[in-house]
Amino acid sequence: MLVKRFQPFLVHLFLWNCLILFALISPIMPSLIILISVPFALIDLWLCFTLGLMLRLPRQRQNTEIRENWISEEKVIDGYPVRWLRTSIDEDKPLAILIHGWNSRPINMEGRSKIFLDSAYNVLLFEMRAHGGNLPVDHWAAMHVCHDFEEVLKIYSNNGWLDNGFIVHGHSMGGFIAQRGLRPELETSKNLKGLVLESPVTSYSLINNATCKVLRIPASLHPWMMKRLLRHYNSMNKDRYTVTDVEFLESPQWGLPDAPTLLIQAKHDSTLGQGHWKHLVDVHSRHDSNFEYHIVEELKHSQERSNEGRDELISDWMEKESLIF
């Protein structure tokens, strides 16, 4: 699959080699042709190589032993074993689904789940593919995980787990997945009662720009690189995962759930910066939505399994929205 990731680089490398070979056998000033071509070739090959680098893979981890009081389950979706942890299901209680962030694992959301357990919820910790010690993948994309999430929501609905309503808490990339998987037009979203977004990703363009900056790609080329990356991505994926344009990958086109939404944002977010939460606030300011947000001084982007300030804000919001049972 590395060949697919770096296919543009390999194709362009072949074409530039062909051009140089042609120049060498050409009777018309071969040295001049090569001299002019080399700078353009180096720039073009570097930009092609970065396309493969931009298709990042999660860090591979070891499986960990399932802790007491958690039940591990999985369902094969599109050839991949999608997993989750859950508590014993009380059919009279609502459900809280928590989605971890990039390079994390579901059990890292256990601390965040306590507030929902204390509020009489069944709790389920959803695992993104290729995380938490699960099987690695050749190519990872948010659209793959969104499809997984939408499919398992159908399973949960068929099991009756969503009948009493459900809340979703998504952290970072987990928040991005939640926004897509809880679109109002989906049948499984009809019993959604609330959404908590903790320092969420809200725009893939912003992710792309940050990656381009790390790769020392000039800012003027960022939009062009994003469009080029989309073409490369679409060539690697099935039609169900196709991304039509850049705007599709950010709120509100990506998804704007029709439920009370609470944004809790780390004030000093060293991972995502300020652009993502500001974009989401702007989107909700232009829509008639039940939206509340808090910028929390004492909250970091990661390593916050327990945070009293965050939990207090969630508890107050749940009480205000009549979500405590």
Residues of each region from the PLM?
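Hydrolase active-site cap/lid region
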Residues: E187-Y241
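The serine-hydrolase catalytic nucleophile loop
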Residues: W102-I115, G275
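Catalytic nucleophile-loop/oxyanion-hole region of alpha/beta-hydrolase
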Residues: N103-P106, H131-N164
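Short beta-strand element of the alpha/beta-hydrolase
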Residues: K93-G101
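Serine-hydrolase catalytic core
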Residues: H232-F325
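An N-terminal hydrophobic leader/cap segment in hydrolases
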Residues: M1-V11, L15-L85
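Gly/Ala-rich beta-loop-alpha elbow adjacent to hydrolase catalytic centers
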Residues: H169-A178
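Conserved alpha/beta-hydrolase
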Residues: F116-L135
